[in-house]
Amino acid sequence: MNTHLFLLINAQEHASKLFILFAVFCANYLILLPIGLLGIYCIYKPVYRTLVIKILISLALVLTVTFIIRHLFYSPRPFVLNVGTNFLTHDKTSSLPSQHAVFIWTICFSIYLNYKKQFKSFAYLSTVVALLVCWSRIYLGVHWPLDILVGMLLSFISVYLIKKFWFLYYKIYK
C-alpha cells in the first residue's frame, strides 16, 4: 500500500520542469514561511511568545524521538530501493519519520491545539504549507507516504503531551 500510494504521488520522468521546480521550492524553502511569520508576529505581539516556547519544547521532544527512531530502525528512501523517480538530491539516511513533516506539523498542531481562535488564518495557512511540503517530499521521491504519516502522528503526540503537561512549567518556574 505504501509503495502503491508513493507511485501515485511521485513525479514521473516526463513531469513538467516548472512543476518540479515548484515542488523543489515547496520541499526546501516553503517550510521557512510559517517560521518567519511566527517570529514576526511574536515580535509585535509579545503575549504570544508562550506559543513559540510550546513549539520549541514540542520540537525538542519530537526531534529527539525522531533521532532515536532513525538510528534504531533504518528505513531506506524510495530512491535507495530504485522505486519511482527521484528529483531531489538527498543523502541515503533513514527516511522514517520525515523530519520535514515532523517540523512543520509540530508548528501546525501547536497552533491548532493551543491558539486556533487567535491564529485562525495562520493555522489555515500553516496547514496548506504543511500539506505542500509533505506532498513535495513524496512527489520528488525522497519520502514514502508512511514517513509523512508517522511524522504527523509523532508531532501530534508531542504537541498534545506538552499541552497536557504545560501546567508543570508554571509550577516550577512561576
Residue ranges of model-derived segments:
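N-terminal signal-anchor/start-transfer transmembrane helix
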Residues: 30-42
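Perimembrane helix-loop-helix junctions
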Residues: 39-47, 141
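Membrane-interface loops
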Residues: 46-115, 173
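Membrane-embedded catalytic cores of phosphoryl/pyrophosphoryl-handling enzymes
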Residues: 88-174
